[in-house]
Swiss-Prot record:
PROSITE patterns: JMJC. It holds the Pfam family Cupin_8. GO terms for molecular function: 2-oxoglutarate-dependent dioxygenase activity. This is JmjC domain-containing protein B. InterPro entries: Cupin_8 (IPR041667), JmjC_dom (IPR003347). It comes from Dictyostelium discoideum (Social amoeba). Residues 112-274 form the JmjC domain.
Amino acid sequence: MFNNTNKIIEIERNNNKNIEKELFYKYLNENEPIIFTKFSTDWEALSKWNDPNYLINIIGNDHIVDVNKCSFGGYYKDIIKIKFSEFISKSINNQFDNFDLNGNKIKKVNKPYLRNFEMFEDFPIFEQDINCDIIFDKDKHNLIVKRAFIGSVGSATSFHIDTGDNLVTVIKGCKFIVMISPNDSKFLDFQKSREIEISFNQNDNDGIPLEYHPAFSNCKYIYKTLLRKGESLFIPNNWTHYVHNISDHDDNFNEDNNNNNNCNNNNNLTISVSCWGKSIYDLVVG
């Protein structure tokens, strides 16, 4: 059996409240992930969005959203059109199917997940609840893109790379995140990572834990973290990463972690905001 224990690195945490642009770009230039534990603790979204009715009252009962599974097997073929209020209700009540028509358990990456939700463009009032773009230098990142990600219980994204420098902040629930550096991504066995589920703790019986997962046998390092409510993770461009949305019962992750915020989530819903810093020049030339 493979043993990856010595390869696993817990992503560093910065506990400063005020994150200056200079410090942020220091991490960016070093091309290393970092968690800012207090950057977003005063965001109104952390309290307002805890009540899903706040979101529904603004978005409306009949607003249709494109919920897509996260297998990245073709964005459009997996899209499910559903009322936003219905998606929230089914997520809260855990009403999405756990087994397919053949009785096989549905993989995490095939569970419904509302990602890249353009709620800030469609409903600008939500802008006042967050404040993520202040960390970006507009001379270096002259295009800031903000999207919401709302996950049903146990949903996940397969390993992928973003199209910009991403600051992802958890508003509700938790996320188990695995990251592989650009230098190591060629050694990641993507096929095995798709075929064999990744279990994030001893209570997650679906798959194999990182320590023994064959997809990482040739990787030099495996970065991991449990990103909690109010924490922000900087994901540098070109880092390959996997994200698993954690339910309210799955908060026993790491007894040695000193962060007092657990993953208690009283209605089986995980919400996060991604704020990408991009360069229009790079998008045009690249």
